[in-house]
Amino acid sequence: MNIFAEAIVNKNTENGDITDTVFGAIEDVMEKAHGGYAGLYLINGVGIVGFRDPHGIRPIVFGSRSPKGNSQVPGTPAKMSKARRSLDYVMASESVAIDTLGFSLVRDIKAGEAIFIDMKTGDCHTRQCHRDASLSPCIFEYVYFARPDSIMDGVSVYESRLKMGEKLADKITRRFPDHDIDVVIPIPDTSRTSALQAAYILGRPFREGFIKNRYIARTFIMPGQAVRKKSVRLKLNTIKSEFAGRNVLLVDDSVVRGTTASEIVDMAREAGALKVYLASAAPPIRYPNIYGIDIPTQTELIAYERNTAQIAEKIGCDWIVYQDTEDLVDAVRSSASLEQPLDSKWMHSFIIVNCCKILYLT
């Protein structure tokens, strides 16, 4: 934000055109700021600008609708302006926000692109602000962060999670053809879609075994292991009848530090489960994600320098199955719309950003 503000001031003294000033400031930001980011700023009396880092690691979309009521450009006195906007515009990190506000999704902002909505004219301006931009989104957006009803870079988050569950079930069947799973239970909320499809493919009943207290924040982003561990019991409570006397497969979106998983496995056993198995819709996470996710050090990661047997022992489950990286990438890539297909370069870029490899983009 400070880089952008300073660049706006400097550019404004050089060039009187506000559109060139804004885009010039964004170009400066992209030259100086390395990493994953999506910015959205309201410039008082000027307009709104949204932009995405040159690798498109973090998402941002924009939408439009026909103006309702008085079509006068906001912030401009009627007697001083004859400008009339033809459309209203909105920008957000996910398409679901655009839907709920009654707008239509136009498209994702491209990697290295900026969009400026001029408050005085109502015009929408776009410009590519980085010459070497290439789309390399973080796959964790699809695994964990995004709402299932969102569309990101042409990919339905819901469809991608269904396919994650399908591929996870296929791997379980390959590894344990004679498995004794009685019931599939999701760890709320993000894993629910994947767990539902996994249960369908495995031919086992899907049950809600945990009830979530919605007033507790996401444990993944809480500071400190002790706080996260304590919060699990405050956040979730078991329906004991779904566990008692059964061999249970718990499905989670990912297993990062293992704190939540370990506590949940204990809760399942306390509720009467005979055996507790764990399946992760994401591959083992062995390296920090430096692009805006709270995974600061390798030593926090349960998969770091451990194999699956050691991880299962550490968590306390009978066995654990992780999604294969290639299957995760394919689950997302194959969920893209026909109008916006994903090329192989985009597919391979996932592998760099998903915390499973130690190659970084910036």
Whereabouts are the PLM-identified features?
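Gly/Ser/Thr-rich beta-alpha loop segments that engage phosphate groups in nucleotides
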Residues: 54, 58, 260, 294
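Long C-terminal interaction/binding lobes of large macromolecular proteins
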Residues: 244
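PRPP-dependent phosphoribosyltransferase catalytic core
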Residues: 28-30, 45-47, 52, 79-81, ...
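Short, electropositive, low-hydrophobicity segments enriched in small/polar residues
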Residues: 60, 67, 116, 195, ...
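N-terminal segments that mediate ammonia production and transfer
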Residues: 1-191, 199-240, 334-340, 344, ...
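Short, contiguous acidic/charged loop-to-helix segments that flank catalytic cores in large enzymes
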Residues: 156, 237-239, 250-256, 296-302
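Extended, hydrophobic alpha-helical segments in both membrane/secreted and soluble proteins
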Residues: 184-187, 191-198, 202, 206, ...
